Amino acid sequence: MTNLRKTHPLMKIINNSFIDLPAPSNISSWWNFGSLLGICLILQILTGLFLAMHYTSDTMTAFSSVTHICRDVNYGWLIRYLHANGASMFFICLFLHVGRGLYYGSYMFMETWNIGVILLFAVMATAFMGYVLPWGQMSFWGATVITNLLSAIPYIGTDLVEWIWGGFSVDKATLTRFFAFHFILPFVIAALAGVHLLFFHETGSNNPSGLTSDSDKIPFHPYYTIKDILGVLILILVLSSLVLFSPDLLGDPDNYIPANPLNTPPHIKPGWYFLFAYAILRSIPNKLGGVLAFVFSILVLALMPLLHTSKQRSMMFRPISQCLFWLLVADLFTLTWIGGQPVEHPFIIIGQLASILYFMLILVLMPLASLTENNLLKW
């Protein structure tokens, strides 16, 4: 009799995705982040569900309801900080996952990669709306500044912003709709992640060498299930350390001040995970130009398959490209730092140089380095 897991319509899908899936024998720990992102998403949906039971999306009571969750609800403080820091862990895993894809040429799986870029935008939109919900100073002013960027769109900009706000400023209508979207989007993300996996299982996994691994496959279970469990344990260790020892490390102190439209904070900045794009936005003096650069800083990922000029898929055997890749990583750290600094000398010029370098590396230097390496192969 054939095993039930191989014949049952539902279990068959799970079996072919997580148990009998043929996987390359040489994939490293950089391939762990897909499963970690799945764990993060489940954690965020569960903690978010319990927070939504106690949260009220009204400008008069939103801030108080978050305080109530932390003070009066059983383990409410734990759920709230797991959710807030879980978002940070989500983005850390996302950035590492994307970085892995860039380094090892995983973007050559076009459908999987493009769904991944859409997922990145969806997660960023969800995180932005979640940041608004506690209705602290940074929530209110962050929402005001970021939504106001849409007014840079010619002709329809102002109408579009007022339509999103549901009035003439960020107010009750804005908060209510942001809560509604923040609740529904994670389920859309889960569905998109399913499509991401569907496309990915059509082609099979890439591996560090970038070569085809059809001749050397091993079953996902037990080898990579055990390997993934180690990653999950490390994730739990880091997240619980963050939540239990310094839950506000990655937050903004201004968000403990209730939102006040009459008092602007000295430095308005979004969550740390947006700072690199925010720095690029601020480095262009023109509003529309800044918005376009902001969007393109992430959308440029969709161009990666078109910018791939190397004869080799992975960067494993390409030292010049490796140097440029790590320069790009350093540049992103610089942009993240600049995004959190006030707009004054010398931060302005550093941000502008880092922004130019970011686009130069991706659009010009890395493709040129790949062509150079192709010629070096002939020697």
Curated annotation (Swiss-Prot):
This protein's GO CC annotations: mitochondrial inner membrane; respiratory chain complex III
Residues holding heme b b566: 97, 196
Signal peptide bounds: none
Residue pairs linked by disulfide bridges in the UniProt entry: none
Cofactor, how bound (note): Binds 2 heme b groups non-covalently.
Subunit organization: The cytochrome bc1 complex contains 11 subunits: 3 respiratory subunits (MT-CYB, CYC1 and UQCRFS1), 2 core proteins (UQCRC1 and UQCRC2) and 6 low-molecular weight proteins (UQCRH/QCR6, UQCRB/QCR7, UQCRQ/QCR8, UQCR10/QCR9, UQCR11/QCR10 and a cleavage product of UQCRFS1). This cytochrome bc1 complex then forms a dimer.
Name of the protein described by the UniProt record: Cytochrome b
